[in-house]
Amino acid sequence: MTFEEAMNRLNEIVERLERGNVGLEESLALFEEGLKLHRFCSEKLKELELKLVEVQEDEAGEVTFEEIVEMEDDLPF
């Protein structure tokens, strides 16, 4: 599953739960699936952040975090 697929499914789950027209058991199942998707997306973002840090490391081994901080402000969650 890609990050985008996981985010789309997570958005679908949130919409269904917000509508409130699902039973208790289905709500619990959707909530559990949503938690798993959230963990998956968080891990993918952490992996991306590590790659960005590696890319931004200069010749002296210094790492600049400016770009990462700016990117975090634009995240949709």
Curated annotation (Swiss-Prot):
Cellular localisation: Cytoplasm
GO biological process, one term: DNA catabolic process
GO cellular component, one term: cytosol
UniProt keyword Magnesium present: no
SUPFAM superfamilies, sorted: XseB-like
EC code(s) of this entry: 3.1.11.6
Catalytic activity: Exonucleolytic cleavage in either 5'- to 3'- or 3'- to 5'-direction to yield nucleoside 5'-phosphates
Key words, A-Z: Cytoplasm, Exonuclease, Hydrolase, Nuclease
UniProt keyword annotation of Cytoplasm present: yes
GO-annotated molecular function: exodeoxyribonuclease VII activity
Function of the molecule: Bidirectionally degrades single-stranded DNA into large acid-insoluble oligonucleotides, which are then degraded further into small acid-soluble oligonucleotides.
Subunit structure: Heterooligomer composed of large and small subunits.
Family classification: Belongs to the XseB family.
Name of the featured protein: Exodeoxyribonuclease 7 small subunit
Organism: Carboxydothermus hydrogenoformans (strain ATCC BAA-161 / DSM 6008 / Z-2901)
